[in-house]
Amino acid sequence: MIVLLAFIHRDLILDTHHIPYDYDTYHWPLFSEVASRVANRQGIGWDTSEYGGAPLLTNVNAAVFYPPHLAVLLAVRLTRLRVTLREFAFVELSHWVLLAVTSFIYLRVRGVARRWTVVSTGILLGSGALLSQSQHLGVIEIVSWLPLALLATEHAVDRRTALSGALLGLVLATMLTAGFLPQFVACLLFLMTWALVRVFQTGAPALRVLLVLAEGLVTALCYGAVIVLPLLHDRATYPQVDAPAAFPVQILKTTFAPDALGHLEGDPARYVNPTDITWSYYYIGAFAVVAGLASLLTRERSARGPQVVLIVLVLAGFGQTADALAGIARSLPVVGQLYRASPVPVLLCFAMWLLLAQALQRGRWPRAVILLTMVLISGGLLLTHAQIGSETARVSAWSMPAVAWIILGASTVALLSQRPTLILAVAVAGVIELVVVNSGGFWFSSPGPAQRWDERHVTSGYDAALAFLQQDKGQFRVAVDQAVMTDTWDNGWRVWGLDSISGFDPQHNGAWVTLAEHLGARQYAAPRRFSLDQLSSGVLQLFNIKYLVWRAGTVPPLPPGLTVAFTDDLYSIVRVATFRPRVYLTSRSCATVSAAFEQTSSRCRDVIRVQVRPSTAGHLDVDLPSGHGAGLLVTGTAAFPGWRAAVDGVSRGTRDAFGAVQAVNVEAGDERVVLDYRPVSTPVGLSISAASLSGLMILALYSQGPLARRRQGARAGRTDGSSSI
């Protein structure tokens, strides 16, 4: 199965892949940026590519403090090697191996026979939800620790010691630092529900168990303080959450229903999805099945629990398969929410894995019924993965689902027969299928427009557009339509080398979202996408945006002030006729949210230029012109709370302008303004994380004495017993 997983990652075995773009065009460039700074012994300051100018330490998806990433960064620091896509692929593949090992260990500890452990773990690794979530590195990294977290939870409930709570906290902290917070919250709910049911079934003292679990959670939060504090205090960048200010509500919303609760943000139309009806199976059922699973896997006292689990899973399987088929019939580029970052389907697969392994072991129901349930669930998941693969690999929209169903059906027959030879033959057929699909050498291979675009896009097709932009030596921003970034999002500009433009600073799109939400824009498409319906040329000026990039032939009707400056068969570049400087002085009354769109007053149109000294993304040094009056120094930098300002050497508070960008009030006669990004939460979080890790080490060392004496006493007891016989 691990070999099969290697085939779906680009550059490990073949040069094509099934994984959509987030994996190799978001997570890799982001981690590569961190690694390059470490290798060059630079500070891990600002990321000038992901989300256009976000602090790296407050971007949880960078996962700088995730222990396996720290190990890689240490190796990079010692060797000063560059993290290529191939090396990065091994980071994710190693977590697939970890998931296989931890799943195998858990089932063996639970007493499941070796053959059913292997079968169930193989089905888990090959489930469509996990495969389709391979593009989200954080999902795979967190889920790979989930079996160990399950063992640690059971150990904490059974032993109820400080050390067991600390061990649970250490596993949870590792999952937390991976950065994919909706998946972590969902897994945490899964584990806590599991612990609660186990308490009722074993008769353990509930209060003591609660204290141990609370110890584990506090330990995890303390160790993960370096990312938790920036999220809560510094409005850290988190792409799965649209409004960081509403962090707790947004995380829970994203966990249970990424698109179904849009009314929380005042715009239900923005979050309507035609597949939400079928997804009600998962939002209600995925966590409801935990009680039945717990009764199945721990000395069950009622036979109804497993039956409820089976019924819910069958309904979920029918719903998901119907959803996948309907999505493909509608020719959706992706099916339902599986393509999105929803953690619920992943947990559903995890629940299916536990149920399948234990049910096969006990033979409580006919194995044909159990495997049929598995087929219904994984069938929809696999169809979804196949549809995603048809968008990124060299296959047609129907060929991959057809092959997927053939392989899935053959696998079911093989498992029902329980003949090792037949199972091995189907596994070999699966390997051949992946090789053929990836290599594009079969008769159904038909590179479509999207694939031809991708081939030119990642080679040299952008050279002409890049050369045009590099001719302009001024300080400006480039905004990119989401359609251009189908494969690379905003960080594609860094891959292309656009950060080499003098003074270039990609637009922080979160500022656009904030501004649009302030103004109640009803049809704002999504984060990282702009719409000329809301962002007129006047608004573009405010953000120092001089050029906009579209795919050729997709430029919409342009409002006054925007003209097409460059076009070829791939790209069209639009120039904003008049745009404001990177930093300028204006009247304080002109920095309101309404002024961002209206710009009716002539005094608000006129700005005073300032002299910018050599600066970086986290440091801005400005000389003010002589004779200026009191006003507002407006920067093009997104307004993060971690900014500190000094005017003529005297500390002065910062504020936001237009509801989105950083600004400083200046008085007449002020000469120099220096802004530095120095968030308090980062060093405080680092201190708490380091202190908690030290505390765990002290607790572990302190516990070695009692544990050793306990083992010695147990050994002595066995010796005395044998001698008396």
Feature roles, as predicted:
Residues V428-I608, R613-D621, P625-H628, A638-F640, ...:
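Extracytoplasmic
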Residues W28-Q42, E50, L70, L217-L297, ...:
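Periplasmic/ER-lumenal interhelical loops and adjacent helix-loop junctions
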Residues E92-R110, R114-F200, V212-L232, T237, ...:
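Membrane-embedded helix bundles of polyisoprenyl
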Residues F7-P147, Q250-W279, A645:
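Active-site lumenal/periplasmic loops and adjacent helix-entry segments of GT-C-fold
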Residues M1-N61, G224, L232-Y238, S446-P447, ...:
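Hydrophobic alpha-helical membrane-insertion signals
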Residues H27, F597-R711, R715, D720:
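Active-site-proximal, structured, solvent-exposed surfaces of multi-pass membrane proteins
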Residues T121, S144, A156-G169, A173, ...:
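Contiguous transmembrane helix-bundle modules in multi-pass membrane proteins
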Residues N61, A89-W96, I123-P147, T177-C187, ...:
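Membrane-interface micro-motifs in multi-pass membrane enzymes
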